[in-house]
């Protein structure tokens, strides 16, 4: 077997293995409308819609992109390009006080859903 051929195959396998390990490198843009809004509708609007308890207590409505970006009566919960500075991400990822983990009193979001929110914020929190 030719040494150059063997080295080429080994190099290709190493590159493919590294690429396969990078599960967080999306091949498409993560947007609010396509990726985040379905999560919000399924897990957040039960409490964070007009007249609901979460919205009343925090002032945080989540019924539109604009409302999500506006934040609570205490200030923004999303800092575009910085999930680690964004309360929304910290709350759903379990990185904040457990007594205020979101969704409150419900099952946690899946790892995939949390990753989608983190990537969306880290890529600028764009609408579409």
Task: Annotate the PLM regions.
Residues 19-128:
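Aromatic- and Gly/Pro-enriched helix-to-coil junctions and flexible linker segments
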Residues 8-17:
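Bacterial N-terminal signal peptides
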